[in-house]
Amino acid sequence: MNKIILTDCDGVLLNWEGAFTNWMSMRGYKVDENNRREYHMGKRYSISSEEKDRIVRAFNESAWMKYLNPLRDAVYYVDLLHRKHGYTFHMCTSLTTDEYAQKLRIENIERLFGKTAFTKYIFCDTGADKDEALEPYRDSGYLWVEDKFE
């Protein structure tokens, strides 16, 4: 049995939301207090869907991708599963198709989780659905870890 875990990145491994909140604040955007817990960033900031798409893409293609903090206990559990139990991870994320932003994301993952825990990186465009990218894993029996419930 291959000991592989498929995982999303933002909201599972990295604190994308916290970094995005700081990035937006530095640019003068304020969270709509009535929508503070909203998953959809357009609603959270009371901006149009088009503006949200443009802003999220700009953030995802920024140098911030190299410096996102890990989410809660992600480093501990990835390390435990990798070193003690022999699992490796394949990451699938809707970051961007920009190759330089992707390199920054990989550098950050390797800095936080080490160079051997993640053996494959799959990048989809900003906000894109991951179904097509995950199709090769259908019926593999691998665990898929995702923060967006659907």
Q: Each predicted region: which residue ranges?
A:
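Conserved Lys-Pro-Asp/Glu-containing loop-to-beta segment of HAD-superfamily phosphomonoesterases
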Residues: F123-E150
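Conserved acidic residues
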Residues: K3, T119, G141-L143
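Metal-dependent phosphoesterase signature
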Residues: K30-V31, Y39-D79, H85
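A short, structured active-site edge motif that brings together acidic residues
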Residues: N35, H90-T97, I106, L112-E132
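Active-site neighborhood of HAD-like aspartate-dependent phosphohydrolases
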Residues: M1-R54
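Short hydrophobic segments within beta-strands
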Residues: D8, C92-S94, V145
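Short, solvent-exposed loop/turn segments at secondary-structure junctions
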Residues: G11-L13, A19-F20, S94-E99, G127-D129, ...
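Substrate-recognition element of Asp-dependent hydrolases with the DxDx(T/V) motif
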Residues: M65-P70, A74-R105, I109
